[in-house]
Amino acid sequence: MRTSHLLEQLMEALRCLPGVGPKSAQRMAFNLLQRNRQGGLQLADALNRAMTDIGHCRDCRTFTEDDICAVCANPRRQENGQICVVESPADIVAVESTGQFSGRYFVLMGHLSPLDGIGPSDIGLDTLEFRLQKETIAELILATNPTVEGEATAHYIAELCHEYGVPATRIAHGVPVGGELELVDGTTLSHSLAGRQKLNLY
């Protein structure tokens, strides 16, 4: 069956979203056209404005409509002296939800991956190195993902920190709260044993 050219374009555009295949894209397109044309127009307007107006923070590289994001512009965050390095803006949301961090961030927008041609400058490490040189940083917290690439990226940044005399720490990885030991994989358990802490009873 031959469908509308515009409809095919809409379905193809929807497929750029993660996890959306041909069937899902078709279902979304038909739903918008049949039941929610106003919602579709609002979606199109919001997407257009976001793609046009949202850029990157000059200091931390997260998404923002302004030159400097709200976190970097906050004087209390600046006085804290801590910078948490993460791989994506979504990681900032995760860290903020804990309520345990009150410093600033630096977003890599990825990780080192030589096989994919992604080097230090591709993830903003030249910008981070400049900040290590110029700013007084009390602690750089490395919160990259516990993957091979994430660990390699953390190690590379730790070496930069050592070069400029900036204390670097790595977030702990281990057995999840509520998890059962027998179900934990060997690598995670190894990290847990290596990063064990002394119990302070008093």
Swiss-Prot record:
Q: Does the keyword RNA-binding apply?
A: no
Any signal peptide, and if so, which residues? Answer: none
What are the UniProt keywords, alphabetically?
DNA damage, DNA recombination, DNA repair, Metal-binding, Zinc, Zinc-finger
As one GO molecular function, the record gives:
zinc ion binding
C4-type ZnF: 57-72
For this protein, the record's SUPFAM superfamilies field holds: Recombination protein RecR
Keyword Amino-acid biosynthesis appears in the UniProt entry: no
InterPro entries given for it?
DNA_Rcmb_RecR (IPR000093), Rcmb_RecR (IPR023627), Rcmb_RecR_Znf (IPR015967), TOPRIM_dom (IPR006171), TOPRIM_RecR (IPR034137)
Q: Which residues form the Toprim domain?
A: 81-176
Q: Which GO terms describe its biological process?
A: DNA recombination; DNA repair
Origin superkingdom? Bacteria
Gene3D superfamilies given in the database record: 3.40.1360.10, 6.10.250.240, RecR Domain 1
Which family is this sequence assigned to?
Answer: Belongs to the RecR family.
Annotated function: May play a role in DNA repair. It seems to be involved in an RecBC-independent recombinational process of DNA repair. It may act with RecF and RecO.
Recorded hits in HAMAP family, A to Z, give: RecR
Name the record gives this protein? Recombination protein RecR
Which gene is annotated as encoding this protein in its UniProt record?
Answer: recR
